[in-house]
Amino acid sequence: MSDAPSSSPDATASHWCYHCNKRVVVETLDDFVVCCECNKGFVESIQPTPAAYSSPAPPQPLSPDLNVEDSSIGSHFLQMLRLLAHAPSQRSPPRHLDVLSYEDDFFRLELNSRNEIDDDEDEDEDDGDEEEEDEEENLTVNDEEDEEDDLRRRNRFPLTTTQSRTGRNRILDWAEILMGIEDNSIEFRMESDRYAGNPADYIDDAAGYEALLQNLAEGDGGGGGGRRGAPPAAKSAIEALETFEVSSSEGEMVMVCAVCKDGMVMGETGKKLPCGHCYHGDCIVPWLGTRNSCPVCRFQLETDDAEYEEERKKRTSTVSDSAAASSSSSTSRY
């Protein structure tokens, strides 16, 4: 075997090594480019970076439509967005990578490896059986390395393509954001104490929360100004309820108290409302102490609330008048 030819290292890191995953200096060995660090041939020449990506563009002056001073928060915010939009990506692989470049590199590696194999066969065709076995082992190793290089190249191609597209999309997104900010008049101001809507709808401190909880409790508790529904029945109306004793005839009807859902047995006493429904005395009296209506038919007893009684009379008179009018109209038709 002859000595390896002299190498001519490239002074600048103009290639990307996919084995080292960084920019490297390469050596040229008979038109075969290898990495100086890992001595692998899985390298790619980096195209010259376009001027658009070479250096970040200087911040442009703010649009006069914003009417914001240079020392304001809006000015610094827009400048920061512009710097982020033009910031170059760090340690990114070559940008101009396509399918043809990968295929060309693959064929170049394949041809170089095959040429080396042919040269080895020509030089070693007079050697013994041991050298032939070594040559077969070398061929197997080279084929395995070629397959590994091919697999790595195919796995890295979607990743590098996605990274390059993501970088371009990121710049376009920032450009759209900046254009939208400059096209629309946006006022940058510090947080103020002004409210949107009615200031009474806001709760600023613990006292406000306590007042809110108190109002909710009063609304659900049924006492004070938060009472809902009809008022309790008058004490005179409760005392005037008819008391009866369950007889044999009534026991056969299987009377059931609608409050406790228990049957009333023969010989037991109960209370009867004017509507005719019967209950246990211990059940209906507490019920009427909170509301004046019958649990079954909603018949209303008198109350001690004068305002409620006045409204009930008005409703009753209105219903009676409408019923009389409807009956008279139906009679006139016939």
UniProtKB/Swiss-Prot annotation:
Residue ranges of the region described as Disordered: 111-158, 307-334
InterPro entries (alphabetical): RNF126-like_zinc-ribbon (IPR039525), Znf_RING (IPR001841), Znf_RING/FYVE/PHD (IPR013083)
Residue pairs linked by disulfide bridges in the UniProt entry: none
Record's compositionally biased regions (Low complexity): 317-334
Compartments reported by the entry: Cytoplasm
PROSITE patterns (UniProt xref): ZF_RING_2 (PS50089)
One matching Pfam family: Zn_ribbon_19
Known EC number: 2.3.2.27
Single GO cellular component term: cytoplasm
Entry annotated with the keyword Zinc-finger: yes
Zinc finger regions, RING-type: 257-298
Mutagenesis / variant outcome for changing residue 277 to A: Abolishes interaction with COP1 and ubiquitination of HY5 in vitro
UniProt-listed GO biological process terms: protein ubiquitination
Function: E3 ubiquitin-protein ligase that mediates ubiquitination and subsequent proteasomal degradation of target proteins. Probably forms a minimal ubiquitin ligase complex in cooperation with the E2 enzyme UBC8. Its interaction with COP1 suggests that it may participate in proteasome-mediated degradation of HY5 in vivo.
PANTHER family (alphabetical): E3 UBIQUITIN-PROTEIN LIGASE PRAJA, OS06G0633500 PROTEIN
Entry comment, domain topic: The RING-type zinc finger domain is required but not sufficient for ubiquitin ligase activity. It mediates the interaction with the RING finger of COP1.
Protein name, UniProt field: E3 ubiquitin-protein ligase CIP8
Source taxonomy: Eukaryota, Viridiplantae, Streptophyta, Embryophyta, Tracheophyta
Gene name as annotated: CIP8
